[in-house]
Amino acid sequence: DTDSDLVLDVDGNPLEVGSEYYIGRAVGFYVVERFSSDVQIDSGLCRSDGFWRVSLDAYSPPTTTSSQQQRYLTVFRDRLSGLKLVGLTDDSDRVVL
């Protein structure tokens, strides 16, 4: 459903605007806005790729000035364990959520 703010993360858990999202044992990030989403349904699995903005503070999202870079959630494969992990990137071409 492209009108929904619901998407599943790499573990199959719902990621929603207004929810808190953790990266390992790090401080939680709050999903504050979805910029765009491309929903694909393949073999019964729903995948949504798009741009999301996250904040350390749910009530006052960060503003981006010309001296600051936008940060995005991305998925990468850990070299030691081979597991897919979630991380932050400032490269908009590497956004995978």
From Swiss-Prot:
Source superkingdom: Eukaryota
UniProt key word Nucleotidyltransferase: no
Alphabetic keyword roster: Protease inhibitor, Serine protease inhibitor
Single GO term (MF): serine-type endopeptidase inhibitor activity
Residue ranges the record marks as coiled coil: none
Homology family: Belongs to the protease inhibitor I3 (leguminous Kunitz-type inhibitor) family.
Its biological purpose: Exhibits Kunitz trypsin protease inhibitor activity.
Name the record gives this protein: Kunitz-type trypsin inhibitor 1
Organism taxonomic ancestry: Eukaryota, Viridiplantae, Streptophyta, Embryophyta, Tracheophyta
